Regions:
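Short, charged/polar micro-motifs that form catalytic or ligand-binding hotspots
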Residues: 20-24, 103-108, 270
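N-terminal pre-first-transmembrane soluble regions of secretory-pathway and organelle membrane proteins
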Residues: 1-94, 293, 297-306
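Long, compositionally biased interface segments
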Residues: 218-308
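Non-cytosolic ectodomains/luminal loops of secretory-pathway membrane proteins
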Residues: 48-255
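Eukaryotic basic, amphipathic alpha-helical target segments in cytosolic regions
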Residues: 38, 42, 125, 140-146, ...
């Protein structure tokens, strides 16, 4: 003899609306569905007010820069910028270098992956470079959530003991974020000039003043360049050379999620805890009504027949 098929029989418990059995069912339902909300909420992860996502920013070098080369003579320097007003202010110290730059797209995704920059500054044989201050200006865009556009910079600084003939930079353009960005809309708050090129005052082009204004932003970029090489010695009539390779890296951004993301995340957590409560209180209901701890009318799926 073997079991060929089986299925459960349904036993129904009936009662009036105003009865102990109805009140017991309401009480059990409340204990089933409400406590999971408190459990998930107290775990400090129910509503994700902020979250992270990764995006490969769209970056382009704007071919704008500000350069100061500090010379061995005390207080002496040579400089160059792409800003006409600044060049007019620095007429005595101004030198015009030879600049070449190109951006590469190695993975062919339509976005630049790196900047290869080269600058040759003509100097007199008596002029020896001991320090470099360089600001490169970029156009920085995000598209995945909010459409964000801003002007950003990469700053390189080096002070040497011995005069140099070449300064090489290898690094990444990274982002620094203070507050979350939105998940949709257009954000052009920082799409303004980092350096006020219309100003005729020397203070506007001072590095510390530029950085004070720039660092007040929520989003800024900086040059992460652990590998800087200072080569000493420069041949007669040879220029001072600055060579830089700056990679554009994928970044992680903090943002404020939308409503449906919050619902989706909260629902997943709530249901995972609710299943445990459903399983437990289902057993409680079976015990209470099967043992008639509260009076009900039992409707069985079969008829009891008296033995003859």
């Amino acid at each position: 003899v073997y079991e060929v098929f089986s299925h459960p029989e349904v036993r129904r418990y009936k009662t009036s609306i105003c009865s102990k059995a109805s009140l017991m069912m309401l009480f059990i339902l409340a204990l089933t569905f409400i406590p999971p909300l408190f459990v998930v909420y107290r775990s400090y992860g129910f509503w994700r007010k902020t979250d992270y996502y990764r995006e490969y920013p769209d970056i382009h070098f704007k071919r704008e820069l500000l350069l100061v080369l500090e010379l061995q003579q005390e207080g002496n320097y040579v400089t160059y910028s792409t800003f006409q007003k600044y060049n007019q202010l620095q007429n005595e110290h101004l030198r015009v270098p030879l600049i070449t730059s190109r951006e590469t797209d190695t993975n062919r995704d339509g976005k630049s992956d790196s900047l290869i920059f080269n600058l040759e500054m003509p100097l007199l044989d008596s002029e020896n470079v001991l320090g470099v201050k360089l600001i490169l200006i970029f156009d920085y865009k995000l598209h995945q959530f909010s459409s964000l556009t801003m002007e950003s910079i990469a700053y390189a600084n080096y002070d040497a003991i011995k005069p140099g003939g070449k300064f090489e930079i290898l690094g990444d353009l990274r982002v620094n974020q203070k507050e979350p960005i939105g998940y949709r809309g257009v954000d052009n708050r920082y799409n303004t000039s980092v350096i006020d090129s219309t100003s005729v005052y020397a203070e506007s082009y001072d590095f510390i003043n530029i950085f004070k204004s720039y660092t007040s932003r929520n989003l800024t970029t900086y040059l992460n360049a652990p590998y800087m090489v200072w080569s000493t010695g420069r041949g007669a009539s040879q220029p001072f050379v600055i060579s830089a390779t700056i990679n554009y890296a994928e970044e992680q951004f903090l943002y404020t999620p939308g409503f449906w993301y919050l619902i989706k995340w909260g629902w997943v957590q709530y249901v995972s805890v609710l299943l445990i409560f459903l399983f437990f209180f289902d057993r409680v209901k079976v015990f209470i009504y099967q043992n008639q701890l509260v009076p009900t009318m039992v409707e069985k799926p079969w008829r009891e027949e008296k033995l003859k």
